[in-house]
Amino acid sequence: SPDDLRSSLHAAKEKFQPKIAWDNHFAAFGSQDVGKILLDYCEQSKIVVYNWHDDTETVYNGMAGAKRCFNELFVKLKDLSGLAAPEIHVEEGNPKSVFLIWRCPTSGFTHCTDTFLFDDAGKIVRQTVCILNEGAPACKAPLCTEPQGGPVQASWDNHFAAFGAQDVDKILLDYTEKSTIKVYNQVTDELVEFKGLKAVKECFTGLFSDLSDLSGLAAPAIRVEEATEGKAGMVFLVWRCPSSGYNHATDTFLFDKDGKIAKQNVVIMKPAAEAGE
């Protein structure tokens, strides 16, 4: 019931001082109140939901899309007894965002993550969602955008090339001392945070040593968006490298006004044994 959801999420909420928009979203989600949840969206809103299970995605645009998204979701969330939100990070600094890890295996949502990007008016203009739900119907093939030019695309092209070449120095060109990378492993429930260039270097040095066998590397979804009025530039990436133990992964990159990566939220599924623990 909605009461179960409210109580399940309440404990997680206690630890945070979330912004007004997130507070409303949280409460509206808990009561499954679609009308209330829509207060946080606008006609510029876009919600992208990717299912790791079958590599398909659904895109919901504008107010009508957001309404359809949550109507469909709340119907699917029939049994909330397993609902948990182990990580909620509300980022007040630009770009304003929320990084969420949640799950509800009792309703088929084995693993889920959302990144919310807010505009200056406190509306959710982008929401990238990855779920692992084996029972969900197949949706559309995921989008890989064509390069359009612009600072975000330039940084992304460099990042992609540097990643493929495992060139740490080249990859650092896209980051600044203010950059933050959060990496959450849904298998081990561990979150590691990297802040600043030294930490970013450590992050990719470790990752590249982990990615010892690239034969299984794939990136089925790459969505690059330049900044627009009131909305930061971003990239939504879904990738995997099961040959190196990375069975599922997704990154949402949020860019600063200069086209550098300000925030990067990474969620992986990597068995602990593979991580050398």
Residue ranges of model-derived segments:
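A beta-strand edge to alpha-helix "cap/lid" segment located at domain peripheries
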Residues: 2-9, 13, 67-151, 157, ...
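Short, well-ordered alpha-helical segments enriched in acidic and aromatic residues
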Residues: 33-50, 167-184
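N-terminal leader/targeting signatures
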Residues: 22-25, 56, 66, 70, ...
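A short gly/proline-enriched turn/hairpin at secondary-structure junctions
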Residues: 45-60, 72, 180-195
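Tandem-repeat/low-complexity and Cys-motif detector
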Residues: 11, 28, 58-62, 90, ...
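Structured segments of extracytoplasmic/periplasmic soluble domains
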Residues: 40, 73-76, 162, 174, ...
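Short, aromatic-enriched amphipathic alpha-helices that serve as compact interaction elements
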Residues: 13-33, 148-167, 174
